[in-house]
Amino acid sequence: MTTTPQPPPQPDETPEGAAGAATAGRDPLEIAADLVDDVSRELDPAELASLERLDQPRRILFVHAHPDDESIGTGATMARYAEAGAGVVLLTATRGELGEVIPPELAHLDPDALAEHRTGELATAMEALGVSDHRFLTRPDGTGYRDSGMVWLEPGRAAAGDDVDPRSLAAADPEEVAARIAEVVREVRPQVVVTYEPGGGYGHPDHVRVHEATVRALVLAAGDGSRGAGGAVPWQVAKVYEIVQPERPVREALRRLAETGAEGAGDPEGPLPSVVVPDGEVTTVVDGTGQVPAKIAALRAHATQVTLDLDAAVPAMRLSNGVPQPVWPQEHYRLVHGVAGGPYDAEGRETDLFAGIAPSS
């Protein structure tokens, strides 16, 4: 039997064939590494950052108005989750240019100098809380939103002043502000977002704007990208919380402060700021007892805005209005989006902001 000699096989010069030849006999791990490098070259930096954050199964975004707000309202919570290994991100809307300065020796600072000083205070506070991911909200051109300022109407209640800077957060296009927050949401991809209740805690116009813009931002972030939020992949936040305080403990603390003669103590039976809500509206309490030292260190860092009286019968902090506010070892929240989950405390409140959320969500 004879056979006809066959010509030697010709190399496959198609792209697929070339790729196969290039990988033949190579270590599979080396091939995988090259594939990852190729993906890295094709994705933009924001997309890569989003993928890297998914390595942290639990991610939480706090949206605040000024440096110091994060430590006052959510400092223990931030420290607790940072300590537990969650991805904790702080977004601050302004640099606090118009904050009322408490120390006389710093009263000379003009708005820009105060902003720089408060940025340094915030960096120190973040270090105390163990949080490394902080960013300021910016306009599309990269500039920041300025503090809108406020006036005190009465103890615990503020409002916008008569002369609002056109560069301020309160004067900005609300849809633009919401879209900028939505871009951060899509980048960070948090399961949980925390911000103010509709009254902004005590009426500060920047707090109110942050609440409104964050609510709108979450709608934009979950949308198809046709409006706002840039071109990043849509993201649906699982749970949204508002910062609140339960009325009964607040009034009890005010009574104790009044009984001890604390200067500036509010009326235990009088009106309260919007952050204080009926006890039954509090859905969640985060026990930050172990993080109180970190919270106090963060509050001390904001020396232009906060003074502390920790030796009083009720350990308290004071803002520029001089009214003592208890330094709580627990921080309270109201769930406004999502489903509550256990474990629950004796009063039926959640004890974990991530309760009920699967790590891969």
Curated annotation (Swiss-Prot):
Q: Which GO terms describe its molecular function?
A: N-acetylglucosaminylinositol deacetylase activity; zinc ion binding
According to its UniProt record, the EC number is 3.5.1.103
List of residues binding Zn(2+)? 66, 69, 207
Sequence segments annotated as region (Disordered): 1-27
Q: Which key words tag this protein in UniProt?
A: Hydrolase, Metal-binding, Zinc
Low complexity bias spans: 16-25
The Gene Ontology biological process annotation of the record reads: mycothiol biosynthetic process
Broad enzyme group: hydrolase
Biased-composition ranges for Pro residues? 1-12
**InterPro entries the record matches:** GlcNAc_PI_deacetylase-related, LmbE-like_dom_sf, Mycothiol_biosynthesis_MshB
**How, per the record, is the cofactor bound?**
Binds 1 zinc ion per subunit.
Q: Which reaction does it catalyse?
A: 1D-myo-inositol 2-acetamido-2-deoxy-alpha-D-glucopyranoside + H2O = 1D-myo-inositol 2-amino-2-deoxy-alpha-D-glucopyranoside + acetate
Q: Which cofactor does it need?
A: Zn(2+)
- Any Pfam family from its record, for instance, is PIG-L
Cited function: Catalyzes the deacetylation of 1D-myo-inositol 2-acetamido-2-deoxy-alpha-D-glucopyranoside (GlcNAc-Ins) in the mycothiol biosynthesis pathway.
In terms of PANTHER family, this protein maps to: 1D-MYO-INOSITOL 2-ACETAMIDO-2-DEOXY-ALPHA-D-GLUCOPYRANOSIDE DEACETYLASE, N-ACETYLGLUCOSAMINYL-PHOSPHATIDYLINOSITOL DE-N-ACETYLASE-RELATED
Give the similarity note: Belongs to the MshB deacetylase family.
Indicate what this protein is called per its UniProt record. 1D-myo-inositol 2-acetamido-2-deoxy-alpha-D-glucopyranoside deacetylase
The gene name on file is mshB
